[in-house]
A protein has these predicted regions:
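Extracellular glycan-interacting surfaces
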Residues: 2-351
Length: 351
């Protein structure tokens, strides 16, 4: 099994520069402590050698056993960990551009990451908190990225990965063996696996749900795709061509929101029906991208559009907007503190 060594933080600038994504514009992590009124950069490296402000962030997540610990993955310089609420960061995996990661729900030292390395899509795992990493999946062809990875929370040895070419691949033994579950011939943007089932966000096709660990799937956005069901209120066009990110309420799995190229849609019945959510966007806005729902209330939602972060506290009737001043970059990831709902985090992608 191939081993991957951690790159020293001192080599960070070289790693990032080699990926052509490390520019002078502001990216990295932003944090709000006042419910989204304003956002501040939170990018200091733990050893004082610099910051992660130049990194393009792909995902942010809390340690499932300790919410003061956060992890952030980057498209250009690996995986980072903070033990003090994003005040300081340390690199625990370099060398591989990471698109997604997931932490074992009962063992925080076990972390799975997915992305691309040496021109191949790969999935890696550490079982010692990042001291060593092993490859558990390597794509058969070049130019294929592993875009998403998820664990079954009820049986974490079950792993799902989604490829850029559309293959959904499953393992029942922690990554020792794999089987092809579905082939969508369309990019898989995200896999979410919760106690209610597995959700696969396929870029131009829609959202699929499985309640039997990936043996069968139902398209839950079929009603949204039907002619006439997309809202005439959308300022971005008349047909959905990109399902971007899905957020499911932590307290009610039937409540979910999806960002698309036409705007924001929500369902209160697990995807049986969908409603368009009007946001204060302009014709010059980008389509909504990142989205997060607060644990404390599924009426509290953060949504990004370009470098603007919108917040609603009433499920989408009224919105406030905060300019993150991220130099026109894209807010690509959002996360709300499960214990302190006034605290939230944003990951910036440098465009």
């Amino acid at each position: 099994m191939k081993k991957f060594l951690i790159i020293a933080i001192a080599a960070l600038s070289l790693t990032a520069a080699s990926c052509n994504l490390f520019g002078a514009t502001t990216a990295g992590i932003l944090k709000t402590s006042n419910g989204g009124v304003d956002w501040q950069a939170s990018n200091i490296l733990k050893d004082g050698t610099g910051s992660i402000a130049g990194l393009s962030i792909s995902k942010i997540a809390f340690d499932p056993l300790a919410t003061e610990i956060l992890y952030a993955s980057s498209y250009n310089a690996g995986l980072y960990k903070s033990v003090d609420g994003a005040a300081n960061w340390e690199q625990i995996l370099g060398q591989i551009p990471i698109i997604d990661f997931v932490i074992h729900p009962y063992d925080s030292k076990t972390i799975y990451v997915s992305g691309a390395f040496e021109e191949r899509g790969r999935a890696l795992v550490t079982r010692d908190g990042g001291k060593s990493w092993n490859a558990i999946y390597t794509a058969a062809t070049n130019s294929t990225a592993v875009r998403s990875i998820a664990l079954n929370p009820n049986s974490p040895e079950q792993i799902a990965i989604g490829l850029s070419e559309g293959e959904l691949i499953l393992s029942n033994d922690g990554g020792a063996t794999w089987r092809l579950a579905q082939s969508y011939n369309d990019r898989i943007n995200k896999i979410i696996w919760n106690s209610d089932g597995m959700y696969v966000v396929v870029k131009a096709t829609g959202i699929f749900k499985s309640t039997d660990s990936g043996n069968s799937f139902q398209l839950i956005t079929a009603g949204l795709q039907s002619a006439g069901n997309t809202s005439t209120l959308s300022i971005f066009g008349s047909s959905i061509s990109s399902y971007n990110q899905l957020a499911i309420s932590p307290s009610n799995s039937g409540t979910m929101y999806v960002t698309t190229n036409l705007g924001l849609y929500r369902s209160f019945n697990g995807g049986l029906t969908w409603q368009f959510v009007t946001m204060p966007l302009s014709q010059s806005s980008l389509a909504p991208t990142a989205i997060a729902i607060a644990n404390s209330s599924d009426n509290v939602i953060y949504v990004s559009d370009g470098d603007i972060i919108y917040k609603t506290a009433d499920g989408g009737t009224a919105w406030s907007a905060a300019d993150t001043k991220s130099s026109g970059n894209l807010i690509n990831a959002l996360l709300v503190d499960p214990e302190v709902p006034q605290a939230a985090y944003a990951g910036v992608f440098a465009r």
